[in-house]
């Protein structure tokens, strides 16, 4: 068996990056319920912040490659993380005009994009051998996904568990501070500077992957819709639902490494979307006793679907296009999440919750058909024929 000396995935530096990514996304996801509570349960303002944050992710994209080539990648992550923390602190200031809240949310998104681009698309690939990067990227993304349930629990559950509601602020910002510390302690190899244009699509947008991008939009839209509905339930119910979503994610992580290791490419996506569908149909029923299982199924479906879509993007990559593919996937998922979340704002008063779930189920059925009939054949035609590295 290879040791950490020959297998970078076992190295302390890579493990630090995985935990740093978990904590980084824990902070970002935890900010959603925190802002919802901070604004007195005003769902409209919270949605505006999410949309402004998403705009902030897009704005700096054309400068991504220039920033990480012109400056130290570690410094880009550290300073961007610090500045997004400053933006978050400013957001929590009482009595800010609404326009300032949205401007700060855009700034938060800008610094978040710079930080995640440095960490997920650049630093991790600098640490790994070419034969280890696909598995490394997959593991890093899984750690980031677990930030969703952990972030929400840090804000909604831990303060009540500890009997100290005043600790909510600290429990929100501690993950970000720990993430900064872990990356600061990571030894990152020096890389010769490469001359790049100030504005480019490198590490920002992979146009040839637009069918996969559209699939990300729809799949993440369902996730955003469901989580928006979850957040509007009483805190105790929200905590319970997030626990089961997290359990489903965890189950999907282990199932993927066993059941799908030698399976057909379509199997993981097919099962993930079927779990999506089953969860939405169960949630549309009035029997609350089956809802816990539905949320667990949804978490598992979300994990499997996102994992396979990322793998498709990586397999689509040509030479030196890995970071661009990763960022395109991230943008698709975050934009789709914001769209799905916003749908609830505009439809929640006019439609029943069960109607939204049935509509979501119909969208999933359509997505599954499009995937099997159009997207998967398209992918087989356009994927990188030289891709030969392990997935799990």
Please place each PLM-identified region on the residue numbering.
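A late C-terminal transmembrane helix in Major Facilitator Superfamily
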Residues: 312, 316-353
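C-terminal transmembrane helical hairpin of 12-TM major facilitator-type secondary transporters
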Residues: 265-309
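Helix-loop boundary and gating motifs at the non-cytosolic
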Residues: 2-54, 211-240
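Cytoplasmic helix-loop-helix junction between adjacent transmembrane helices
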Residues: 106-142
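Transmembrane alpha-helices of Major Facilitator/SLC transporters
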Residues: 57-61, 239-265, 272
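Intracellular juxtamembrane helix-capping segments at the cytosolic ends
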Residues: 114-128, 303-318
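Symmetry-related core transmembrane helices of the 12-TM Major Facilitator Superfamily/SLC fold
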Residues: 165-185, 355-377
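Glycine-rich segments within core transmembrane alpha-helices of 12-TM secondary carriers
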Residues: 132-156, 330-342
